[in-house]
């Protein structure tokens, strides 16, 4: 009986010391972040030769070929030219021209997403060709690209 009493006492003590352990709820938050610098690639027309007597010659296109821009920002391209081809042997002899997008003179454009482009044409009036002196003529066209 002593064994039985010892066993009962041990069982009672074990039951008395049993307790369910509860862990306190603990939530933590972490931040995941990255930064992407704005990047873009703009393609501009290459050197172009205008055939004698050609009123309209393709000048290629300005194209935003790749872009990761900030929201609300754009890539702006401005074109600057004298509008006059000068004779290499006598710079006082000139041939007027315009660079056009469609039927309008082109000066600038803004691009917001990759793939946007503006086709350009070099336009020389027939009358200007008729008045031009023989020789080689050149001018430089400057493209300014900015991010705003």
Task: Report each predicted region and the residues it spans.
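Short, Gly/Pro- and small/polar-rich lid/capping loops
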Residues: 15
